[in-house]
């Protein structure tokens, strides 16, 4: 990881104070997160998780409310133990594909359908021809009634890149273990459903994978104003709390293992749908990346550089170009969903994928990197803990905090644009 303390000190004089304030915001978010885990807790009925965490002496379960509470010391201990680097880490702005969109885009199809095995084979060949810009991948698209292990073996034909699977969808212990000890495979597991509610079957898979020694990517995707508060800071707190909970479980099982931070919060439209075309989607994920690069020091993978467009048209291409530029100009560690996905991750398109890859080559070829660290001007929210304490694992959409902050993400993106820090 870069020396971000040094980078802040070396930053342009007119950026320095804003960057110092931004780092203080991330430190406060991390502190608030530990308070959320200690006082609000995580909803769960998973006996293995409860037994595992209570055995540390730093967590306690309250059966009357069905929540487990973690002391800050357990989070500190887990972060201290966790790996901060991994084999194959290519550093900042490593982009890839992932998320397993449910449908393959086919022009003229009346009804959307997943891919066939033959189509997946073809897509993996296409990805293999673009590994100069696509440096990691999970399955590009769902296969109709596909066996996860068979899909993984198709992906395993690719060398010189990191492949990502989800062992939670595999049957049997051997299926989980087949990639154990391999540096070129990571296991992406979402063990917490936002907001702050343990998915017990997924946590069983996380524990099994940690015991097998797999490299983990701990993922969660809170929706601002729906399953998380409608402000950037409070939304990040929910995201951070969910990943820190999974981290505590994994590090208790297997101290020192790789646990990439995969918290990928999402902006939403007033109708509740995802909004991957919004500039704040990319800014929000840059902020989460910085929280980890600057404070926790965990390797991180974010989301962005995508689109809500439903077909691979000029708008879809422009959204991807703009989003990837925001991610890379401000700087992330890893980011997925960056190539070929449409309609807020519902579709994967070969046409869009090839256009996105070529556009990224042109960006890299023409980029003039002055090396300056640029502030995000992340807005603060002094009610972040209060709203999470009040709503906990219920619906944030009906809370007054959401109503009072409906324009928070629009205002943030406009403020950054007004400072000339977003693409024209």
Predicted regions: what they are:
Residues 25-29, 34, 91-110, 294-307:
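N-terminal small/glycine-rich loop or linker at the start of catalytic domains
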Residues 43-50, 63-65, 254-261, 295-303, ...:
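Flexible, glycine/charged-enriched surface loops at secondary-structure junctions
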Residues 111-333:
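Helix-rich catalytic cores of soluble enzyme domains
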Residues 48-111:
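Glycine-rich, N-terminal phosphate-binding loop and its surrounding beta-alpha-beta segment
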Residues 2-10, 17-32, 40, 45-52, ...:
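Catalytic-core signal marking the mid-to-C-terminal active-site face
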């Amino acid at each position: 990881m870069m020396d971000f303390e040094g980078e802040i000190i070396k930053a342009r004089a007119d950026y320095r104070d804003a960057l110092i304030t931004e780092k203080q915001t991330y430190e406060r978010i991390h502190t608030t997160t530990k308070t959320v885990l200690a006082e609000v807790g995580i909803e769960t009925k998973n006996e293995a998780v409860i037994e595992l965490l209570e055995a540390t002496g730093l967590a306690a379960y309250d059966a009357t409310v069905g929540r487990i509470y973690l002391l800050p010391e357990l989070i500190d201990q887990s972060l201290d133990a966790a790996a901060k680097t991994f084999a194959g880490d290519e550093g900042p702005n490593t982009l890839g594909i992932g998320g397993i969109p449910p449908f393959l885009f086919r022009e003229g199809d009346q009804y959307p359908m997943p891919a066939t095995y033959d189509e997946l084979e073809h897509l993996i060949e296409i990805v293999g021809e673009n590994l100069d810009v696509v440096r990691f991948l999970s399955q590009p698209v769902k296969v109709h009634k596909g066996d996860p292990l068979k899909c993984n073996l198709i992906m395993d034909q690719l060398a010189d890149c990191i492949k990502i699977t989800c062992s939670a969808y595999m049957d049997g212990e051997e299926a989980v273990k087949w990639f154990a000890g391999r540096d070129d495979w990571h296991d992406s597991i979402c063990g917490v459903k936002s907001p702050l509610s343990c998915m017990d079957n997924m946590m069983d898979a996380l524990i099994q994978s940690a015991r097998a020694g797999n490299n983990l990517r701990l993922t969660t995707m809170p929706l601002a104003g729906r399953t998380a508060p409608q402000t950037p800071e409070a939304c990040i707190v929910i995201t951070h709390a969910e990943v820190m909970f999974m981290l505590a479980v994994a590090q208790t099982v297997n101290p020192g293992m790789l646990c990439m931070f995969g918290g990928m919060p999402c902006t939403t439209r007033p109708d509740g749908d995802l909004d991957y075309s919004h500039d704040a989607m990319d800014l929000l994920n840059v902020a989460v990346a910085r929280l980890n690069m600057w404070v926790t020091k965990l390797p991180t993978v974010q989301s962005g550089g995508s689109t809500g467009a439903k077909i691979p048209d000029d708008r879809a291409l422009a959204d991807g170009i703009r989003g990837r530029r925001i991610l890379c100009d401000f700087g992330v560690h890893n980011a997925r969903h960056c190539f070929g996905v449409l309609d807020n991750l519902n579709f994967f398109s070969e046409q869009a994928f090839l256009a996105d890859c070529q556009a990224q080559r042109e960006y890299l070829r023409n980029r003039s990197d002055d090396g300056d660290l640029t502030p995000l001007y992340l807005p603060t929210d002094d009610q972040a803990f209060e709203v999470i304490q009040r709503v906990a694992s219920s619906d944030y959409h009906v809370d007054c905090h959401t109503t009072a902050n409906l324009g928070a993400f629009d205002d943030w993106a406009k403020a950054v644009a007004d400072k000339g820090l977003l693409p024209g």
